[in-house]
């Protein structure tokens, strides 16, 4: 969703809009809502209102890929080395197009370990 002055947007108003779109009847299972603003040549600022979390998250790789793909197909960005800035940091996105069809999508950025855990053999048998 294009949104001018996204970085200065009222958080509560943006959250309410995200919630309305997330629960829109055309999306029976709900949807993540990605707000974006072009901030420079091949540079985007993005905020994601994520279903299940029901609030903004620091980043969403799937949503970021969709935003850059849509902007590329609309001719707003080149699709090469597009910098997407989010609360959680920056991703670099490359869109590999064959005509108007996306063949591959590459996201590059930092990673962090946020949780460690163990899965036992007994737990695997439940799946």
Place the predicted regions along the sequence by residue.
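An anionic, turn-rich surface loop/hairpin at beta-sheet edges
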Residues: 62-63
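Active-site proximal loop and beta-alpha junction motif in alpha/beta enzyme cores
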Residues: 1-59, 68-127
């Amino acid at each position: 969703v294009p949104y001018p002055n996204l970085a200065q947007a009222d958080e509560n108003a943006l959250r309410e809009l995200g919630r309305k779109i997330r629960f829109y009847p055309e999306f029976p299972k709900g949807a993540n809502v990605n707000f974006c603003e072009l901030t420079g040549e091949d540079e985007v600022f993005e905020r994601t209102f994520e279903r299940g979390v029901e609030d903004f998250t620091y980043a969403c790789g799937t949503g970021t890929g969709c935003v850059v793909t849509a902007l590329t197909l609309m001719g707003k960005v080149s699709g090469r080395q597009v910098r997407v800035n989010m609360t959680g940091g920056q991703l670099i996105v490359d869109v590999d197009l064959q005509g108007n069809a996306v063949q591959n999508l590459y996201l590059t950025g930092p990673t962090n370990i946020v949780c460690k855990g163990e899965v036992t053999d007994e737990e695997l048998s439940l799946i």
